[in-house]
Amino acid sequence: MVSPVTQPSRHSGLGIESVVPPALPGLSPTSESTKPMSASPIADRWIVLKFGGTSVSRRHRWNTIGQLAKKRADETGGRVLVVVSALSGVTNELTAIADGAADSRERVAALVTRHNEFLAELELGAEVLAERLAALQALLDDPRAASRPLDWQAEVLGQGELLSSSVGAAYLRSNGLDFGWMDAREWLDALPPAPNQTEWSQRLSVNCQWQGGGDFKQRFSAQPTRMLISQGFIARHGDGGTAILGRGGSDTSAAYFGALLGASRVEIWTDVPGMFSANPKDVPDARLLTRLDYYEAQEIATTGA
């Protein structure tokens, strides 16, 4: 299969070339970028793995993520960064809340229940997410909530990835894996506004700096654990607040990290074996497209497939 997700079209400077690594049970790679391994010390060599919402919403999926991350670290002798999306469907709920849905409190309550139930499935205590869920609830009582300014909306939208990554880090550590957690907003910076860029896109559909110097990699690699987990979708705005990369931005986050770290690979993983002619969850007879080049995939995406 030729991967359809070779590089985000609006970030063509990242220069990603696609190959396909072997699949693991329950998850399949949709793309992998490769560049020659640098001569840097092993502690500074990175592989980036990205997992979407359905891939982080069940316990057995997290088991696979942990196994894959450890395998990549062991086989390369390097380090691994895992980038995750929010649990499946959570961003849709947060979008409704950010848009001012009349039943926002009920939606937040449902999200709290769902995440606590997931903690129970993982045999983790409620304290793992106590502060994060309290922060989500507090956003409804924030004075900004009445007028819903863009900076408040960005904070709401980014909660899903902060929650899922916190759950994942706690679970993987409970399984004895050397995982640390990091806030993507401390490492990915939104670019200054472009000419004629709308205020909305300056906050909720940003591009990020992807050309980092040796200082970035040195500081990043100083984090003590062999493997790290972070969030897709979010970055730091120029005012220090939260910025959003836009829907589907978690894949782009992984590409940014890969470029900044000079990673040897960036792998985008999913729970389906490739690109289909239609959504297989909605169309039972959807066909797996066994061969598809980047431009064909781009055309299909443009038509809303």
Labelled PLM ranges:
Residues 2-3, 17-27, 32-305:
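Nucleotide/pyrophosphate-binding catalytic subdomain
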